[in-house]
Amino acid sequence: MTVLTIEEMAETLAPRQAIAGLDLGTKTIGLSMSDLGRRFATPRTVIRRVKFAIDAQALLDFAQSEKVAGFVIGLPMNMDGSAGPRVQATRAFVRNMEQKTALPFVYWDERLSTVAAERTLLEMDVSRAKRAERIDSAAASFILQGALDRLSLLARSDGDEFSA
């Protein structure tokens, strides 16, 4: 497993490979998936965290069943750009995943992703109970969509045949 920049991931991905977005929390891991064209992020499921070995296996099972080519994981930065208190835990999670998978990870600034997800769910008139169930996968979707937008921009600037 390697930690890549988004630019490095753009170079390593083959056409029509999906990537997953992760919103790592203390109690849950929100998951989202891209389409094969890597244009759209869709909220998927939430893994209830137990302990690392169980969490990692659940994530790897998801990756295998969805044919994931890589992960974009939210990095919880402070608004001033400094490392937030959960950055160290996120980096440790990825370091531990190095022992479990060869799939690459990209860190993606997740500032305001949960706020944006909450706002979207409110606008969709989702009940409070349903919002609580869906917020983590929705936040993962916002994280992944940001990375997908960047990948699309990189493809256009390279004259990639798959760009819009």
From Swiss-Prot:
EC id: 3.1.-.-
Main location as per UniProt: cytoplasm
GO MF: nuclease activity
Taxonomic superkingdom: Bacteria
Pfam family, one: RuvX
GO process annotations (BP): rRNA 5'-end processing
InterPro entries the UniProt entry points to: RNaseH-like_sf (IPR012337), YqgF (IPR005227), YqgF/RNaseH-like_dom (IPR006641), YqgF/RNaseH-like_dom_sf (IPR037027)
Gene Ontology CC entries for this record: cytosol
Compartment(s): Cytoplasm
Keyword Cytoplasm: yes
Keyword annotations from UniProtKB, A to Z: Cytoplasm, Hydrolase, Nuclease, Ribosome biogenesis
Family as reported in the entry's similarity comment: Belongs to the YqgF nuclease family.
PANTHER family linked to this entry: POLYNUCLEOTIDYL TRANSFERASE, RIBONUCLEASE H-LIKE SUPERFAMILY PROTEIN
Biological function: Could be a nuclease involved in processing of the 5'-end of pre-16S rRNA.
HAMAP family named in the record: Nuclease_YqgF
NCBIfam families, alphabetized: RNAse_H_YqgF
Protein name: Putative pre-16S rRNA nuclease
The organism of origin for this protein: Rhizobium johnstonii (strain DSM 114642 / LMG 32736 / 3841) (Rhizobium leguminosarum bv. viciae)
Lineage: Bacteria, Pseudomonadati, Pseudomonadota, Alphaproteobacteria, Hyphomicrobiales
